[in-house]
């Protein structure tokens, strides 16, 4: 498919995000490259940014999980810690940076519940982990969005090279998926609609602070739906 053709791109009016068309058909899923067939769908080209999430909050008055609890988890001193005052506006906590200089970075410190609330407001939904992986991997079973080459600092944000998130699209087009989706390895873990166990929700993609092995497209993480980390964000999908 021509990933750059107008027929394969669409601006969703509610939140103004560009979406990418993923055609129906089989792809190779998971570590064992199982053949899975999915119907066609649309998915956001990039993760939701701080600017876009702020627009949602301004329109609805929404208060995030971390703002309610007063705590978010951050990797600010070389280890994971619960930080008072860490939330989407201050990912590392007060005094450790805010989003004013990161308008085009992916929003983080959002729970699965927060991501779902945004998606519902936008008239979309979270992708399943199979939908997420197909959009990231294409149909040929590659290890990374760009192919099978090991990740480098020119292809994605990982292993604390940048010390925080980077603007969406920084590694485009060289790091893009076959369908033209951006930032699907590294930068942030992305919430999906998929459940694991009684209460866990699946995240995919690998975050900015994680080693290279975690940005392989088959890797998954599972968090409780109310957990908030400075590596966790999301993108949305919708049915045709």
Locations of regions flagged by a protein language model:
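Acidic, metal-coordinating catalytic segment for phosphate/diphosphate chemistry
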Residues: 49
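Short, structured beta-strand segments at or near domain termini in extracellular proteins/domains
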Residues: 230-240
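Short, P/G- and charge-enriched loop/turn segments at secondary-structure junctions
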Residues: 6-10, 31-33, 220-225
